[in-house]
Swiss-Prot record:
It is found in: Cytoplasm. Its cofactor is a divalent metal cation. Nucleotidase that shows phosphatase activity on nucleoside 5'-monophosphates. Its main location: cytoplasm. It catalyses: a ribonucleoside 5'-phosphate + H2O = a ribonucleoside + phosphate. It comes from the Bacteria. Keywords: Cytoplasm, Hydrolase, Metal-binding, Nucleotide-binding. This is 5'-nucleotidase SurE. Its EC number is 3.1.3.5. Coiled coil: none annotated.
Length: 249
């Protein structure tokens, strides 16, 4: 089996190196990742310039683009032999609840949705790699066990691992996405020439983090695993929308 590994923290990120090391003796692993940090890139594609893959000394391939660019190239022609599945991460920082809408880590996994096997997005609840071995352990465990899964086509599994030593993890919980409150207002700054600029501020506080959510699971010391799908159609809105449209005719 061949696994395409990518991330949004960049090709030299410790989480990517740890993920590759965890899977290297399980499958033929190919790493294609952004040449710099692309956190928050979501599913964006680069359309205003060419992409230039560059093979590094360790065999990893860096690309001057987004995580989605990297997986797109890997699946659609850059590799002589197409991968069987996509595994993204290990992100240093959580991707919980609404975070998945912005996450380049999750987006890389979503780009692998056309392959025959589920894609995985792994995130670690710390910006520091102290307990990264815990995340690598669960990445290997879940990827190796995927062959026993019977999931709908194009399913992506979003996995978040607490920042704990392995022996302190309480288990794995199947979860739904929680929700955050509205994000903080952008931070206004003024440069030396008097021009105003803005920094995107922190994500909103957890608003829906009760039992059953990914937020709740990781706080309780569990690895959370949330199945995601591409179809964002709001079926619950069909009835009221049909009534509304009837009134417009």
């Amino acid at each position: 089996m061949r696994i395409l590994i990518s991330n949004d923290d960049g090709v030299n990120a410790p989480g990517l190196v740890a993920l590759h090391a965890a899977l290297a003796d399980y499958a033929d692993c190919v790493v294609i990742a952004p040449d710099q940090d692309k956190s928050g890139a979501s599913s964006s594609l680069t359309l205003d310039r060419p992409l230039h893959p560059h093979t590094l000394e360790n065999g990893f391939i860096s690309v001057n683009g987004t995580p989605t660019d990297c997986v797109h190239l890997g699946i659609h022609g850059l590799l002589e032999r197409q991968p069987d599945m996509v595994v993204s991460g290990i992100n240093l920082g959580a991707n919980l609840g609404d975070d998945v809408l912005y996450s380049g880590t999750v987006a890389a996994a979503l780009e692998g949705r056309f392959l025959q096997r589920p894609s995985f997005a792994f995130s670690f609840l710390s910006r520091q790699p102290d307990n990264l071995a815990t995340a690598a352990h669960y990445a290997r465990l879940l990827v190796e066990a995927h062959e026993q899964l019977d999931l709908p086509p194009r399913t992506v599994l979003n996995v978040n691992i607490p920042n704990l030593p392995l022996e302190h993890i309480r288990g794995i919980q199947l979860t739904r996405l929680g929700h955050r409150a509205r994000a903080a207002a952008p931070i206004r700054v003024v440069d030396p020439r008097g021009r105003a600029g803005y920094w995107i501020a922190a994500a909103g506080d957890v608003e829906d983090g009760g039992a059953g959510t990914d937020f709740h699971a990781v706080v309780q010391g569990y690895v959370s695993i949330t199945p995601l799908q591409l179809d964002r159609t709001c079926q619950d809105g069909f009835s009221s929308l049909n009534t509304w449209l009837e009134g417009l005719r």
